[in-house]
C-alpha cells in the first residue's frame, strides 16, 4: 500500500537536495575538476534534481473533483474572455514572437503547483521536462493569452529569482502571487490587481492559539512565513514577544514547519491558508480582518498595496501592462474569488 506524502514535504525534500548539491557536491568534488568537467557535472546534477522532483510529485495526483456539478460550471459564473486577437501586439516588448513567457514557483498552491499530467487544463513547464503547472495563476495566464491569441510558456523559478528574471527580460511577466508593494513596484511595473487577498494566520486545532481572536492573543508564539513577503517582513513583527524563525524558502516548506510542530503558527494570505486547510483538516485559519485585532498598516491604501496581488512586467513596458489590465478589468473581485475556489477544488491532494 502506497504511503501518501504531503506535497509540502515533497517540495521540501527537493529544495533540500538542491541546496545539498550546490553547497556540498560542488564544494567538495568540483575542486578536482576542470571548467569543462564542472559544467558537465552541473548539467548532470540539474537533470538529476529535475528527475527527483518528478518522482517526488509522482504520487501527487491532481484532485479531479470539484465543489459540485460539472467541472466547468464555474465558467458560467465569470465573464467570457473578450476576443482581442485583432489587436496588434507585435511591437510589445517580449511579445514580438507571440509568446508570453510567465514565471511562477510552480510550488505555491493554490496559486500555482506542479503536477504530472495535463488534467484540469494544466500547462507544460518549459524548464521541467514532463511536468505541468496548474492553479489560479495558470488560469489567469491562460485567460490573458486566449484573449490576444498568444502562446503561453510557463517557467518554474525560485521566488527570489522572479523579479530579477523580469528585469533581465528572461520572463515577460510574473504571475506568482506577488503583492503590489511600493518596494516591488520600484523595480517592476505591475498590472492588476488580479486578486484581492486577506492576511491571516494558520495554526493547528490542538494549539493553544487555535481560539485566538486577535494578534494580541498570539503573543509569545513561535512563528514564520515565506521569505520576501509582507507577511514575514511587516506582519509577524507586530506580534508582541513573538519568536520569529528564519523565513521559509517556499510556501510548502512554511506549511510543513507548522505541520511538524516547528512553529506554533504561520502568517500567509487567505488562499494559501484555504488550500492548506483543504488538504489537512488538522489546520485552522485565524482571520482577524475587519477587527481592531488585525495586522496594522498606516492606511487602508497601504493595506491594499501590501495585500492585493499584481502581475509583474518590465519597468516601462506600459504596452504589456495595459494589455494585461484590459483583460483583468473585465473581472470583479467576486469573479476572481470564483476562479480561486476552483483552483482550491482541483489542487493536488495529500
Regions found by a protein language model. Give the residues of each.
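Short, Lys/Arg-enriched N-terminal segments with co-localized hydrophobic residues
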Residues: 6-40
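Sec-dependent signal peptide recognition
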Residues: 42-50
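C-terminal motif of bacterial Sec signal peptides marking the signal peptidase cleavage site
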Residues: 56-59
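Extended ligand-binding regions for polar small-molecule ligands
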Residues: 61-84, 140-147, 206-209, 220-222, ...
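Extracytoplasmic small-molecule ligand-binding "clamshell" domains
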Residues: 67-178
Amino acid at each position: 500500500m502506497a504511503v501518501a506524502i504531503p506535497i509540502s514535504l515533497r517540495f521540501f525534500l527537493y529544495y533540500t537536495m538542491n541546496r545539498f548539491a550546490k553547497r556540498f557536491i560542488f564544494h567538495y568534488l568540483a575542486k578536482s575538476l576542470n571548467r569543462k568537467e564542472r559544467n558537465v557535472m552541473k548539467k548532470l546534477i540539474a537533470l538529476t534534481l529535475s528527475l527527483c522532483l518528478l518522482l517526488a510529485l509522482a504520487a501527487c495526483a491532481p484532485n479531479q473533483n470539484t465543489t459540485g456539478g460539472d467541472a466547468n460550471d464555474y465558467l458560467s459564473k465569470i465573464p467570457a474572455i473578450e476576443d482581442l486577437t485583432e489587436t496588434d501586439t507585435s511591437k510589445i516588448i517580449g511579445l514580438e514572437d507571440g509568446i508570453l513567457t510567465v514565471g511562477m514557483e510552480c510550488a505555491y498552491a493554490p496559486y500555482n503547483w506542479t503536477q504530472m499530467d495535463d488534467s484540469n487544463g494544466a500547462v507544460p513547464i518549459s524548464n521541467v521536462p514532463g511536468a505541468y503547472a496548474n492553479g489560479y495563476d495558470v488560469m489567469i495566464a491562460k485567460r490573458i493569452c486566449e484573449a490576444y491569441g498568444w502562446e503561453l510558456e510557463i517557467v518554474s523559478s525560485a521566488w527570489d529569482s522572479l523579479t530579477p528574471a523580469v528585469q533581465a527580460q528572461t520572463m515577460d511577466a510574473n504571475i506568482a502571487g506577488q503583492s503590489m508593494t511600493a518596494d516591488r513596484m520600484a523595480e517592476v511595473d505591475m498590472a492588476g490587481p488580479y486578486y484581492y487577498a486577506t492576511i491571516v494566520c494558520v495554526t493547528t486545532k490542538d494549539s493553544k492559539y487555535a481560539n485566538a481572536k486577535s494578534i494580541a492573543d498570539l503573543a509569545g508564539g513561535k512563528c514564520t512565513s515565506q521569505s520576501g513577503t509582507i507577511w514575514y517582513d511587516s506582519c509577524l513583527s507586530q506580534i508582541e514577544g513573538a519568536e520569529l524563525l528564519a523565513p521559509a524558502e517556499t510556501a510548502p516548506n512554511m506549511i510543513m514547519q507548522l505541520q511538524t510542530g516547528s512553529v506554533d503558527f504561520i502568517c500567509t494570505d487567505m488562499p494559501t491558508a484555504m488550500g492548506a486547510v483543504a488538504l489537512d483538516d488538522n489546520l485552522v485559519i485565524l482571520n482577524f480582518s475587519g477587527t481592531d485585532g488585525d495586522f496594522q498598516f498606516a492606511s487602508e491604501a497601504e493595506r491594499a498595496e501590501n495585500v492585493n496581488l499584481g502581475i509583474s512586467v518590465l519597468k516601462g513596458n506600459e504596452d504589456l501592462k495595459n494589455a494585461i489590465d484590459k483583460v483583468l478589468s473585465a473581472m470583479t473581485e467576486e469573479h476572481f474569488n470564483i476562479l480561486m475556489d476552483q483552483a482550491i477544488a482541483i489542487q493536488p491532494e495529500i
